[in-house]
Amino acid sequence: MILLSAIITIGAFVYWVSLVQSDKEVTGLAEFVPLILLAPFVLAVLIRFNYWQVIGDAVEVTENQFGDLYAQYSDIAAEMGLDKLPRLYMGNGNGVLNAFAAKCTVRRSFVVIYSDLLDLMYEHGDVNGVRFILAHELGHVKLKHVAIWRFVVNVIPEYLWIGRSVTRAQEYSADRCAMHYAPEGASSMMALYAGKRLYRRVDPIAYFASFDDHKIGFWARASNLVSTHPQGHRRMRALWAMQSEGLDHHGRML
């Protein structure tokens, strides 16, 4: 990515200089060449700024800080064959159950898991559930969902109103990755929809049946279409199906 940025920057600079030195009026797309020159630098600055905005209020997980969690995390990353272990941070969820992967530099990634999700492991003894979450986020890294080139390419789907379909597909892919490396924790994803205290009390058969009673029509599809993640019942149904049908099962997009 750095090499590509350098090539684009140098090419744009040479083109801009040739236009300026000529007597031709600079119009059209040529007017945006200075912005193209600045784009790689601006992107690098934004990545670092966002990284410090996040980790400034977080706790880094290391061998000496939540060592048992770090061991689970590093083991999964090693199984995935990741060349570099992304830094892991615990953020205060303030009641929100979430985790995400992002860039900390142009070439390196990091993962954040909220403290409320870690309650599954530390308060309820659900180590497998947390392993699944960690595998899901590392799956995003392994599948290069946080790569810079994807960020650039995803601009096009956004303009075509299909950007969120791309992110939903990525969530399904990361779930399949997690199913491969930590399948025992798949059912714990119900915590995202029933909460960290009651998720184990949810009967999956009754849960799916309650949605089967509804006709999946226009409004259900429209709601799913504008979501960055698959709706809970679709995501859980896909995970449930993968447990019996294998990783080739794909969740519904529309």
Short names for language-model regions:
Residues Y73, I113, N128-H145, A174-D175:
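Active-site recognition of the HExxH zinc-binding catalytic motif
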Residues A135-V153, P183-A186:
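Catalytic Zn2+-binding segment of zinc metalloproteases
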Residues G91-F110:
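Catalytic zinc-binding patch centered on the HExxH motif and its immediate surroundings
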Residues D116-F132, S165-R168:
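Short pre-active-site segment immediately N-terminal to the catalytic Zn-binding motif
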Residues G232-W240:
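Amphipathic alpha-helical oligomerization/assembly segments
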Residues E63-L85, W161-H214, A241-L247, G251-L254:
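Short helix/loop segments within enzyme catalytic domains
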Residues T105, K144-S165, I205-H233:
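Alpha-helical membrane-targeting segments
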Residues M1-V96, R252-L254:
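Hydrophobic or amphipathic, alpha-helical segments that drive membrane association/targeting
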